[in-house]
């Protein structure tokens, strides 16, 4: 409520002192009880250009900072779009949790812990096809591409995921033919040995594809 200035700085220092106490407790647990802890500290949002408010769409309002005690992070941690969504998959990978496939396909983030095969999944519509592309971090193995023609998951049901392609990770993408069945939305998930990415590809139901249009 006070914007940029000494008052805000004072409370940043106070918060930093509280986090320091947590960090000292973590180091004690690791030393005295042979435990391994993952610590991630981040803000919930940014502020506007003058240091006020939240919920805006400016670069500063949308930007957060993040810090972790992980000694080794992958390239995801350095991406400009690193976000809150990356925290959950990072925790799951650190803890060794086996996330069910249907849940993993819904996760919007990527782990910044452990190896990363691909990142930055994009799509482009061309006639009745969707051209998927991704950037390669480690060019080994294959990428399995899955597609769902609905979003039953939103109603607590299972989506009908169909594997539509398998290509080398190093190809950096593939083209998926949507066939003759129209849908309002297509969901895609790309799965490699170490990474799962997803995106939604909306379609205008009032303008179905026709080779004659």
Segments from the language model and where they lie:
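Active-site His/acidic residue clusters
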Residues: 1-17, 53
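Histidine-centered active-site microenvironments of extracellular/periplasmic hydrolases
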Residues: 41-71, 118, 202
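Substrate-binding rim/cap in mid-to-C-terminal beta-strand-loop elements of soluble/periplasmic
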Residues: 56-98
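Polar, surface-exposed loop/tail segments
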Residues: 82, 95-129
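Conserved aromatic anchor
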Residues: 130-139
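Extracellular low-complexity, O-glycosylation-prone stalks/linkers
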Residues: 141-162
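Beta-strand-rich modules
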Residues: 176-197
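Edge beta-strands of extracellular beta-sandwich domains
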Residues: 196-213
